[in-house]
């Protein structure tokens, strides 16, 4: 199973863009060359602010959706405080049920 990653890119005007991918370096290059998300085109210099492996695609999509609902202040906290991200991640992970 290919691991999925969540990433946040900071634009020149200090906005944070949230996305998911299986290859952060490739996706970051695509954004930098204008071949990524339209939301980042023409936004000036882009910097990778945060990236973390999150598991499978399903979980990555749920985390991406949840982060896109956060305020700018809350997103900044995810970037600067590892505990904040870990807390969000654990709240979205579904428990594995074992068949006995």
Curated annotation (Swiss-Prot):
Residues 2-77 form the GIY-YIG domain. The gene is yhbQ. This is UPF0213 protein YhbQ. Belongs to the UPF0213 family. SUPFAM superfamilies: GIY-YIG endonuclease (SSF82771). It comes from Salmonella arizonae (strain ATCC BAA-731 / CDC346-86 / RSK2980). Coiled coil: none annotated.
């Amino acid at each position: 199973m290919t691991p999925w990653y969540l990433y946040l890119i900071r634009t020149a005007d200090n906005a944070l863009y949230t996305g998911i991918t299986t290859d952060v370096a490739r996706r970051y290059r695509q954004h930098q060359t204008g071949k990524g998300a339209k939301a980042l085109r023409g936004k000036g210099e882009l910097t990778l602010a945060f990236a973390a492996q999150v598991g499978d695609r399903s979980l990555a999509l749920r985390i991406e959706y949840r982060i896109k609902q956060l305020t700018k202040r809350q997103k900044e906290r995810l970037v600067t405080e590892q505990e904040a991200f870990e807390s969000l991640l654990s709240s979205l992970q579904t428990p594995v049920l074992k068949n006995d």
